[in-house]
């Protein structure tokens, strides 16, 4: 079963927690739709900032949006101009004041979402897929990952028949619930069609029951801005 399901969904409440953290009654669907719109807008607006994930919390007064990005300077802009514009955009979309936090990802090479997006961008630039996969694996292992697996599927290299190629190094225990496994997907839009990229990164085991382990680790590595 561990090989079939999303590794993050399987570990929710064990060593991962939700990216949308709020409760709602009758207006649940509206708030969920708002979250989707906010995330889509941020992905589109901050495509060059290396955004890994967006956490949305809704306390009693105003929503709080936390952006985990590899290049926070792109988000903030000169003298904080860009972040002010972004905050106004989010406030207009949410129809209420929004608190905005930026957290820097110090090691983007071991963030599964960023690794997948990087490989997808290389495929779009016609870099050989095996070279892109191998380079990503070597970088992740050098920076402390205990294991990594990368899947690329589609018309790789412009082949007539689509296929799936994968590369793995170290161990990636998908059945072990206490394993801290990061998972990311990305799509490369090539001239031959779309290619899917999936990345699993094993960072070690979390022995204690700690759903907020990922957030705590990110906060320790970089102060919030």
Curated annotation (Swiss-Prot):
GO cellular component, one term: cytosolic small ribosomal subunit
UniProt entry tagged with the keyword Manganese: no
Residue intervals of the KH type-2 domain: 38-106
Key words, A-Z: Ribonucleoprotein, Ribosomal protein, RNA-binding, rRNA-binding
GO molecular function: mRNA binding; rRNA binding; structural constituent of ribosome
Superkingdom, taxonomy of origin: Bacteria
Biological processes per GO annotation: translation
Keyword Repressor set for record: no
Xref: SMART domains: KH
InterPro entries for this protein: KH_dom (IPR004087), KH_dom-like_a/b (IPR015946), KH_dom_type_2 (IPR004044), KH_sf_prok-type (IPR009019), Ribosomal_S3_C_sf (IPR036419), Ribosomal_uS3_bac-typ (IPR005704), Ribosomal_uS3_C (IPR001351), Ribosomal_uS3_CS (IPR018280)
Known partners and oligomeric status: Part of the 30S ribosomal subunit. Forms a tight complex with proteins S10 and S14.
Family, per entry: Belongs to the universal ribosomal protein uS3 family.
Role of this protein: Binds the lower part of the 30S subunit head. Binds mRNA in the 70S ribosome, positioning it for translation.
Official protein name in the record: Small ribosomal subunit protein uS3
């Amino acid at each position: 079963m561990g090989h079939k399901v999303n590794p993050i969904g399987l570990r929710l409440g064990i060593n991962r927690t939700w990216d949308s953290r709020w409760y709602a009654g009758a207006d649940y669907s509206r708030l969920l739709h708002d979250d989707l719109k906010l995330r889509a807008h941020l992905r589109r607006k901050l495509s060059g900032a290396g955004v890994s994930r967006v956490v949305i919390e809704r306390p009693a007064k105003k929503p709080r949006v936390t952006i985990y990005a590899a290049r926070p300077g792109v988000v903030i802009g000169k003298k904080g101009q860009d972040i002010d514009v972004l905050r106004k955009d989010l406030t207009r979309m949410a129809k209420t004041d929004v608190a905005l936090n930026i957290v820097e990802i110090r090691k983007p090479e071991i963030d599964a979402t960023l690794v997948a997006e990087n490989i997808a961008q290389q495929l779009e630039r016609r870099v050989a897929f095996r070279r892109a996969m191998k380079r990503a694996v070597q970088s992740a292992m050098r920076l402390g990952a205990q294991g990594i697996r990368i899947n690329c599927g589609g018309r790789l290299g412009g082949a007539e028949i689509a296929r799936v190629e994968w590369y793995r190094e170290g161990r990636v225990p998908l059945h072990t619930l206490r394993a801290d496994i990061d998972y990311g997907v990305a799509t490369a839009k090539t001239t031959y069609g779309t290619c899917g990229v999936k990345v699993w990164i094993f960072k070690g085991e979390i022995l204690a029951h700690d759903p907020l382990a990922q957030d705590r680790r990110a906060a320790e590595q970089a102060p919030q801005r």
